[in-house]
Amino acid sequence: MADQSIISALVLGLIEGLTEFIPVSSTAHVLLAGHFLGFKSPGNTFAVLIQLGAILAILLVYFQKLLAIALALPTSVKARRFVFSVLLAFLPAALIGAAAHGFIKSVLFETPMLICVVLIVGGIILYAIDRLPLTPRYTDVFDYPPSLALKIGLFQCLAMIPGTSRSGATIAGALLMGTDKRSAAEFSFFLAMPTMVGAFALDLYKNRDALSFDDVGLIAAGFIAAFIAGIFVVRSLLDFVSHRGFTPFAIWRILVGTAGLVGLWLLG
């Protein structure tokens, strides 16, 4: 196994873990990095299984909260309403994602230039929203009514366009609907759990005939890197956005999208 391939797998896993839960689009970063690194994964296995590292990271960090919610379900109306709200928010992406999976993966994901443009446009939109003088009406995710959760879930559907960012779409939608920045990011975490598990299961099923474990080392390297980086981001993001907002992510999106366009132009 070439050392260069291991390094590329580690880099891509690190990128996946660092970008999955922040509003910069992990898909865009992983696809563009893989394109410029010339990384060839074994079948579709690497691209599918690398997501599992990030999924396990958020489940581990939020295990105590998830357990507390589960134990409260029999007696707490608030807990039941919260779980219902998260599942309701997940529903639009589940339905549209299942119906349009082939088109999204075979057409949109194969267009690096589109990804770069969407990164830039999304960065400009996120910057504008972060600068709006919005007055939050909701500061606790457990107070989000189901109707608000559903609207946030509809925003999440925009993330099916590579480069949009699942967390970016949900956070932007939540802010526009009257949430504060911290709870918007936290609801995005909770919504990520069923969404990422569902997307992972669908990808695994759709790619079942192409899956290959010929290079377990590459898969393990990317998985571990995504897992460790994901833990770091999930543990630190809420405090970060409470103090700095989302402008740093907006600027990063614009820079990466611009650099990607320049790179694609130079490489012809």
From Swiss-Prot:
Its main location: membrane. It catalyses: di-trans,octa-cis-undecaprenyl diphosphate + H2O = di-trans,octa-cis-undecaprenyl phosphate + phosphate + H(+). Pfam families: BacA. Its EC number is 3.6.1.27. It is found in: Cell inner membrane. The chain crosses the membrane at residues 5-25, 43-63, 84-104, 107-127, 184-204, 213-233, 248-268. It comes from the Bacteria. Disulfide bonds: none annotated. Belongs to the UppP family. Bacitracin is thought to be involved in the inhibition of peptidoglycan synthesis by sequestering undecaprenyl diphosphate, thereby reducing the pool of lipid carrier available. This is Undecaprenyl-diphosphatase. It comes from Rhizobium meliloti (strain 1021) (Ensifer meliloti). The gene is uppP.
